[in-house]
């Protein structure tokens, strides 16, 4: 039982990027996909997908370009995502990159404004 507690502690210490990488590695190792249950649930809902005129409720905020003030943009990215300094720097320098997925319209607008105020070029999809 102590081994399980140790694993929980180690997993809790992972950054978001490290957790995503771990997920990908486990998917490959076990031959499964973490997205499959979501696709099945969406297919079961069925009727919701049949109405194409619905308004978009989830948005993706993409950092298109960091601009000249990279340090300010890195600070904003850290505040928005909770990433560490190195991960935020890598995200900013690797633009275009997704900063936030599944954001509400208001949240996406706030993130876009904050990043643009810091000097970045941002797209909301």
UniProtKB/Swiss-Prot annotation:
GO molecular function: mRNA binding; structural constituent of ribosome
GO cellular component: cytosolic large ribosomal subunit
GO biological process: translation
Gene3D superfamilies found in the cross-reference section: 3.30.1390.10, Single helix bin
Keywords associated with the record: Ribonucleoprotein, Ribosomal protein
SUPFAM superfamilies, sorted: ClpS-like, Ribosomal protein L7/12, oligomerisation (N-terminal) domain
Record-linked InterPro entries: Ribosomal_bL12, Ribosomal_bL12_C, Ribosomal_bL12_C/ClpS-like, Ribosomal_bL12_oligo, Ribosomal_bL12_oligo_N_sf
Pfam families on file: Ribosomal_L12, Ribosomal_L12_N
GTP-binding listed as a keyword: no
Role played: Forms part of the ribosomal stalk which helps the ribosome interact with GTP-bound translation factors. Is thus essential for accurate translation.
PANTHER family from the UniProt entry: 39S RIBOSOMAL PROTEIN L12 (PTHR45987), LARGE RIBOSOMAL SUBUNIT PROTEIN BL12M (PTHR45987:SF4)
Family under the similarity heading: Belongs to the bacterial ribosomal protein bL12 family.
HAMAP family listed in its UniProt record: Ribosomal_bL12 (MF_00368)
Quaternary organization: Homodimer. Part of the ribosomal stalk of the 50S ribosomal subunit. Forms a multimeric L10(L12)X complex, where L10 forms an elongated spine to which 2 to 4 L12 dimers bind in a sequential fashion. Binds GTP-bound translation factors.
Name the record gives this protein: Large ribosomal subunit protein bL12
Encoding gene per record: rplL
């Amino acid at each position: 039982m102590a081994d399980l507690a140790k694993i929980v502690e180690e997993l809790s210490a992972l950054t978001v990027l490290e957790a995503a990488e771990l997920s990908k590695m486990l998917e490959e190792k076990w031959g499964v996909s973490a997205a499959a249950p979501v696709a099945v649930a969406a297919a079961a809902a069925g009727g919701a997908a049949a109405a194409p005129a619905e308004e978009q409720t989830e948005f993706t905020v993409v950092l298109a370009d960091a601009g000249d003030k990279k340090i300010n943009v890195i600070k904003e990215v850290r505040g928005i995502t909770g990433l560490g300094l190195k991960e935020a720097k890598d995200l900013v320098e690797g633009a275009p990159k997704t900063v936030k997925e599944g954001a509400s319209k208001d949240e996406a607008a706030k993130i876009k404004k904050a990043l643009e105020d810091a000097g970045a070029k941002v797209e909301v999809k």
